[in-house]
């Protein structure tokens, strides 16, 4: 694999500490993915981890541990970087997931998109694990020079072997559940790392447009994500938000799943939050969401890449207040994402039922019956003690209707601008 790292020392934005503070790769040891020289040691630690071996035994119960680990060591030969690890180990796993759990994946990007550049792919969020995994496969198969480093919340890294595995797979850690002071420091460090990764390590980054998945599929870019991007920019950006964001080469990305296997779990959350004051998800809930998302049926899956927003950012008035700039950038990213949804019959059916509209030219009676059967099957999985059937159904329908609503609004706004 091509390695074009040119990292040595990086000058941080003065708000990260003392002005001109020099940062190198080891400044980010607490959050960064593993470097090539660390991979062999960590791989051996994985093979000696009891819980990891139990998981591997579940996949190949007929193989003795010594044989299984011997085969894994053989596969690891020649792995010199995290990208090599992705191609050797993760690519076959992701292909298996696509074969078993989808009705096919497709990927689109502008014809003139520079596949040798480095970007932040900022997307809506559908699955905790697979959003970035599918993207990496699509980028690799689509001729992009690099796959992505990804941000993953430490609330999901509940076992040491999981943390090791994701860091081998180009993941950096996003810390959750912090105090306000800790959050400021953590956000600054992550921002500095993202700038460092894109411009010094020469890596692509995938990150979601908001913290956590939008439970109702109303995908909106959080200002806080854009503020985090800007806060760790290098000195030469001179505290200018537009220059700071252009330094990251943000390319909006739209992810469209025909079916969300976690839709019934999200509906459950809505009822629990409505009925149980102070209810919060447990670690077990997070694990169930991860497992359901990975193993559940998704139907058709489509990824659509938008043009990098650097040129558009250059048209903004630099004298605008920061708050206004963040608002305009978030709205532009949302329009790019919303206008590129791949809409399926179930989306139109859901909106018609909720809004009383008639888009029957977008689906057949067979489509409607199949979606009704799908909803009934998902509703049967609900674990709420006293399920409010009407409420749960409305919540699930909303998840499928919102992409259509946002798509229609975005297309109308774009046509008005033109």
Residue ranges and their predicted role:
Residues 193-195, 287, 365-378, 398-402:
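Short, highly charged low-complexity linear segments
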Residues 11-12, 90-310, 314, 381-385:
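Soluble catalytic domains of membrane acyltransferases
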């Amino acid at each position: 694999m091509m390695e074009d790292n040119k990292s040595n020392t990086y000058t941080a934005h003065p708000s990260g500490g003392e002005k001109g503070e020099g940062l190198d790769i080891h400044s980010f040891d607490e959050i960064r993915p593993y470097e090539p020289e660390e991979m062999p040691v960590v791989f051996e630690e994985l093979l000696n981890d009891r819980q990891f071996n139990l998981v591997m035994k579940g996949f190949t119960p007929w193989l003795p541990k010594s044989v299984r680990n011997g085969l894994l060591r053989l596969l690891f030969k020649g792995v010199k970087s995290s990208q090599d690890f992705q191609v050797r180990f993760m690519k076959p796993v992701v292909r298996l997931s696509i074969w078993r759990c989808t009705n096919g994946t497709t990927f689109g990007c502008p014809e003139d998109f520079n596949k040798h550049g480095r970007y932040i792919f900022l997307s809506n969020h559908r699955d905790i694990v697979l959003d970035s995994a599918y993207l990496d496969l699509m980028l690799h198969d689509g001729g992009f020079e690099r796959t992505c480093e990804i941000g993953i919340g430490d609330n999901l890294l509940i076992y040491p072997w999981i943390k090791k595995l994701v860091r081998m797979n180009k993941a950096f850690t996003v810390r959750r559940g912090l105090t306000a002071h800790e959050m400021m420091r953590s956000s600054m460090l992550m921002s500095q790392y993202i700038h460092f990764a894109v411009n010094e390590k020469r890596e692509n980054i995938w990150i979601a447009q908001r913290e956590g998945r939008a439970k109702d599929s109303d995908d909106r870019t959080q200002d806080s994500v854009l503020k985090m991007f800007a806060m760790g920019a290098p000195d030469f950006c001179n505290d200018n938000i537009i220059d700071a964001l252009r330094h990251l080469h943000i390319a909006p990305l739209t992810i469209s799943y025909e079916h969300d296997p976690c839709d019934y779990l999200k509906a459950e959350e809505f009822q629990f939050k409505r009925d149980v004051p102070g209810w919060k998800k447990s670690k077990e809930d997070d694990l169930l969401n991860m497992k359901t998302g990975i193993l559940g049926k998704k139907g058709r899956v489509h990824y659509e890449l938008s043009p990098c927003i650097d040129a558009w950012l250059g048209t903004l008035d630099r004298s605008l207040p920061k708050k206004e700039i963040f608002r305009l950038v978030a709205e532009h990213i949302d329009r790019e994402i919303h206008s590129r949804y791949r809409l399926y019959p179930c989306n139109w059916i859901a909106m018609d039922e909720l809004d009383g509209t008639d888009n029957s030219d977008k689906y057949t009676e067979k489509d409607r019956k199949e979606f009704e059967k799908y909803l009934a099957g998902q509703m049967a999985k609900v674990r709420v003690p006293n399920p409010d059937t009407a409420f749960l159904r409305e919540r699930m329908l909303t998840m499928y209707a919102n992409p259509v609503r946002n798509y229609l609004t975005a297309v109308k706004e774009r046509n008005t601008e033109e």
